[in-house]
Amino acid sequence: MSIGLTFTGRIEGPAALAEAAKILAEQRGCSLSVNRTGLRLELCPLGGQLNMLWRPGEAPEDPWLVRGECVSTPAGAGLHRAAVELLDGLPIRRLAVEDETGFFRHRNFQRMKEEHFYTWLRTLVEVCARESGKGVSGMQLCWDLGQYAPEDIPDTVVTPMGRFRLSELADMVERDGIEALAGRFFLWNGRTQDARFYRNRAINALWEHCCFAPSSRSQEDEAVNAAILDDLERAAKLDPSLPLPRASYEEVCALAGREPVLADGPALEEEFSPGYRKGPVTHALGALRLTLPGGYLYRWEQWDSGGAHLWTDGGSDSPIWRVNAYHAREGEAQFTDSLNALHGVEGRELRGGALRWGWREIQEDGEPLYQAVCEVIAGPALYLLTATCTGPEGLGQIAQTIGGISVVTNTARRETVQTQKE
């Protein structure tokens, strides 16, 4: 269930369209990426993209054909308006737009919000209200299933804009009206990128991306921390009366080594303080579910032949995790004999699979290290995990993490995806 638009049209060629998009991107302050088959304009987080693909006409003399789309939820009505206005400025002939909100035709922003985006939001509120008080765990709204899953807290819902009690959304609508909730739930609910837009963009980054680690740890931490502070400071200048997450602002200032500059003003008061990555988060690789501290950074480690998924927090004393996935050519995956030479080998059954693990001492750059090796089988899939630490005391933490490993069957994954769509 989403709101968006699709379009088709004709263009002189990719170069002319890309050049026009570049000019618009510079004017509107959005980013542009172009490849040989199309382009993407990034207007805001939460899927705030205008995507388009092109192909030549049937005959050499025919114009090129272009098609594209923008999905406007959960980002908000401001994104929808911005996407329509970008289409207005692009050299696309015979432009045909399928806009379920009707905004491309009538251009009444308030009408679009009330008839479509607020109706969409009320539906989500009703879903949460029905589940309230049942002790529901793992409920997510508008969450990207391709990334980590935050820690479960019963009777709450995870969203890109923060964690809420299931009853809280309905209470807010009853107390303050749908407009108030929309201004907090949608990242871009206004006509323009106003103070609330910058505040909400910072709130999204605090909840979803910030590791609450020093900026000196990595370029990723430096960029995220700086963006949060810049957005909150800009929001305060545009509207000094707007409530802001001031405690989080001061916390990130300390991490970034920046002096707080916000003048006194109202604080955004909420039950849950920002930061999914302050707690444990669960990563999905196929059927495997691996729960690690949220502060760990992920990257793909390239090897001469292949590579591995790698998680580390940059600290010398914390385990470094690597994961590889393999698939049996026929039948079910089986454990290998590689673990037989390890110390303390043990195993356990999982719902939908099984695992075995042990540990060994290794040398790396002349330094003694301890490494746990774990194999997980789930149907035809075999997952090989290693966790390397500097001392034997780190094996206890690794054992706890391995104790939390689970696998998800295809049936369960289908049910999860269906729940997210509903």
Predicted regions and their residues:
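Acidic (Asp/Glu-rich) sequence patches and key acidic residues
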Residues: 1-278, 283, 304-311, 315-322
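Short, flexible beta-strand-to-coil junctions
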Residues: 12, 37, 314-316, 326-330, ...
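Short secondary-structure junctions
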Residues: 22-35, 97, 294-302, 340-355
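Signature of long, low-cysteine stretches enriched in small and polar/charged residues
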Residues: 284, 335-391, 415-422
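Secretory pathway targeting signatures of secreted, lumenal, and periplasmic proteins
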Residues: 284-337
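Mixed-charge, glycine-accented linear interaction segment located at domain edges/termini
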Residues: 388-419
